[in-house]
Design a protein with these regions (language model features):
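Glycine-rich phosphate-binding loops of nucleotide-dependent enzymes
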Residues: 1-234
Length: 234
């Protein structure tokens, strides 16, 4: 599989179940080690880096299955996401010196800004397990944004959302791109992807079968066959 993503764009990665989309995200974000090939980011080749190092470089992600700290508040979840940008370190956290306290206050302010950005500041002190499914998705996005990413990889962010929530999500992704953040999007809602992405790549059984503008991908016979079967495509 080979593709490139323009900085500041929204790039979609679609395909049937089991096509390898999430596996690709896991490779890009360091959860899986790739067997061969190269992964270049902003002019540098990234080889066998851990997820925390990749996050520190500017690549953040959300997960297909929501991974929040259920018994922590919304604001605490976002603050945890900010740890890759902290300077105090372990000893500063233990000593609780003035610099650490100042940094923690700045982290909390930034976390409130991000909750406001995703529309959740009014729920800042609510436990994440008490949020609706759609709000938990938005909270996970806020936590990823807390790392100040250059690239944000969203793995099925619209899963389980109703039509109203999907519309709000679409507006949020557009707003994220407006801040100069490149967005990688895995999503089964083809209508959402086609209306949102600048370019799309399609995977099937671990191979790329198409890439291009949304309208071109939508008409590609290989894509139609992958989704509907050879008889329908014919």
């Amino acid at each position: 599989v080979s593709f490139s993503v323009d900085e500041g764009s929204i790039f979609g990665l679609i395909g049937p179940n089991g096509a390898g989309k999430t596996t690709m995200f896991n490779v890009l974000t360091g959860l899986y080690v790739h067997d061969e090939g190269t992964f270049a980011f902003r002019g540098s080749t990234l080889q066998q880096m851990t997820p925390d190092r990749i996050a520190a470089l500017g690549i953040a992600r959300t997960f297909q299955n929501i991974r929040l700290f259920a018994n922590l508040s919304a604001i605490e979840n976002v603050m945890i996401g900010r740890h890759v940008r902290t300077k105090a370190g372990v000893w500063g956290a233990i000593a609780r010196d003035a610099a650490t306290r100042t940094e923690e206050a700045a982290i909390e302010r930034r976390s409130h800004e991000l909750l406001q950005f995703v529309g959740l500041d009014a729920r800042a002190n609510d436990l994440s397990k008490h949020l609706s499914y759609g709000d938990q998705r938005r909270l996970e996005i806020a936590r990823a944004l807390a790392t100040d990413p250059k690239v944000l990889a969203l793995d099925e962010p619209a899963a389980g959302m109703n039509a109203t929530e999907k519309l709000a999500l679409r507006e949020l992704i557009v707003a994220i791109r407006a801040q100069g953040i490149t967005v990688l999007l895995i999503e089964h809602d083809v209508k959402l992807v086609m209306g949102l992405c600048d370019r799309i790549a399609v995977l099937d059984y671990g191979k790329k079968i198409a890439e291009g503008l949304p309208q071109d991908v939508q008409r590609d016979p290989n894509v139609i066959e992958a989704y509907l079967g050879a008889e329908v495509a014919a």
